[in-house]
Amino acid sequence: RTMCTFLGAGTLIGPDDINDQHIKNHKIAYLEGYLWDNENAKKAMKKMVDICKADNQQIAFTLSDLFCVDRHRDSFRELIENDIDILFANEDEIKAQSQESNFEGAVEYAKSLKMTVAITRAEKGSVVVEKDKVIEINPIQVDKVVDTTGAGDLYAAGLLFGIAREKDISTCGNYASVAAAEIISHYGARPLVKLSNLI
């Protein structure tokens, strides 16, 4: 698969577009690492972080892309260590962010963060690190992997759905796997069935 990321309208978002009341009506804010490439969008996300922290909301962040990590490693590190409660990454991204050469070292880095870190590993499933606990999440088998576009996004949606409903982390991980499995079974990044019917 070859991908060329197009941020579209995301590049037009700035601090003035952030409505305090809309953000305060939610339990978790989800920030996208790709938007770090745009200075105005970065300012908008920093404003969201300030609002969420003042309101004791959880903040989730995805590393987005290996090259994105390479471009922003230091500022990502500062954000993760100071502001983030839930971190999403795939195996390559977490190794790049931690600058560890192997997965085991990257998991130790994730444990050192003392937060929830979800690491996807393609056909190997995923690992969710919750403070110092490491929970292995099995993949959901599909008849045929058709298109992996959107798998990480749907995985994050499933995990956050569970966390927002205060489910245990293994259940949250299973929700994430179910959502990701649905999206890789067909073309396109939108589910063809109602995800709540699958859990």
Predicted features along the sequence, with ranges:
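Conserved phosphate-binding/catalytic region of the ribokinase-like
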Residues: L12-I13, D50-A54, D74, Q99-I199
